[in-house]
Amino acid sequence: MSLFDDGLEDLDRHPTHAHHPAQVIHDGPFVLEDGEPLQRTGMLVLSDEHLEHARAAIAPLAAHLAHAFLVFSEAGLLVHASVRGEQVYVTLAPDQFSTFVWSGPQAVFLGNVDGSGGVLDALKVDRRRTVFNVTFEVYGAFPARLLTRRAYFADAGVLATGPGSPSVACVYKHEFNDYCIMLPSRAPDVSLTLSRPQVAKLAAVAKGAAAGTTFALARGLDFSVSSSAGVVTFPARDRDGTAVLERASQRRQGVDAVGATEPFAMTLETAHGLLTLLQRLRAGNAELTFNFFTTPRQAPLFSVTTCGPVRATTFFFCAPADPATVPAAPEGAAATVAAACGAGASAAPAAGDKRPAAPRMYTPIAKRPRAASGEGGHAYGDLF
C-alpha cells in the first residue's frame, strides 16, 4: 500500500494538529449525526515537481495568504488574496496536481487558521523541515463541506539520508458559504512581456512618482511608463514571423507584444501596491507579462502575471488618459530599450467579430453552487 493511499492508518492515529479553539480536532472518520460517514467529494495532491511549481508561485506571496480565499472546483484551485489592497490570484489547473479528483459545485474555504498561520503555510519555504506532499481532501455536501489539509514532512536532511518516519500536520476547515468573487472573463487587448531588468526600470519610474503613473502605447508602437520622476520607453519595431523566429535564438533585449495596436493610455493613481507586488513577483521570475484591458475606455485596467507553470496574477484599476499627452523619453536615453514586437494582432478581434462596445469584464462566483451542467463556468487557466 502506498504511503498516500486511502489507508493512512498509522499517520491518522497520531496526527499533529493545529491547536486552536476554532479548529476541529479530529482523530477518526468524519460522520454525520446519524452515524453515516461523510463522502469524500474532492482530493487534490501536490508532490514532486507539481509541489515545487506551486511553491514557486505561492512562496513569494506567502506572508499575505493567511486570510486568502481558497476556491476548489472542477477547474482546479484558485487562491484569491489581497496585497496592499490589490487583488491577487494564484491558479492551479487540474493537470498541475499530482492527483486531482473533484465532484460537485465549487467550494470556498478561508485560509486562516490562527493569528499567525494558514492552510497554505505548507507551501512556504521551511529550512527546518522538508514538506514532500500536500493533500487537500473535501468531505460532505454543499453548503456544509469540510476541508482536510495534510502536509507530510520530514526534518531537513532526513529524506536525503534515507527513508524515515514522516510526520503529518493536519488542518480542518469548514466551508465558507457567504462570498462573491469577481473573476475576469475575457482576453486582454494588449499583452507585453518584460524582462526582469525592464521591470526594474518600470518600478524605478513608479517609485519616484509624486502623483500617478501612466502606461501608454503610442501609435508608433512605443510602450512607455511615465510619472513625475521620469519616463521609460520601450520602442517596438513591427516584424514578420520570420524575423521573430530568427530573433528567438538570440538574447532578447526588448518587449514582446501581442494584441491590438490601437494607441491607449491609462493612469494608475497610486503605485504603492504595484511596487510591493512587483518586488514579490520578480522573485524567481525572469519575466512578467503586463496585460492591458483598454475597453470600456472609461474604466481601463491592467494585470501583471508571472510566466511560470503556476501563475500568479494581480489587477490594477486605472483612470483613462490621453496618449497624445504622454511625454517621450529623451533621444538616446539610457532607459530606452530597443524592442521586437510580434507582427499581427493575435488577440485582436477577427474580421466580422461583433463584440459589444462594453464587454462584460467579470464573471462572478457567488455563494450558490454552479449548475451541474457547468454552464457559465470557466477554466482558471483561460481567465489568467
Curated annotation (Swiss-Prot):
Keywords: DNA replication, DNA-binding, Host nucleus. GO terms for cellular component: host cell nucleus. Pfam families: Herpes_UL42. Signal peptide: none annotated. Its main location: host cell. One of its GO terms (biological process) is DNA replication. Plays an essential role in viral DNA replication by acting as the polymerase accessory subunit. Associates with the viral polymerase to increase its processivity and forms high-affinity direct interactions with DNA. Facilitates the origin-binding protein loading onto DNA thus increasing its ability to assemble into a functional complex capable of unwinding duplex DNA. Interacts with the DNA polymerase catalytic subunit. Interacts with the origin-binding protein. Belongs to the herpesviridae DNA polymerase processivity factor family. This is DNA polymerase processivity factor.
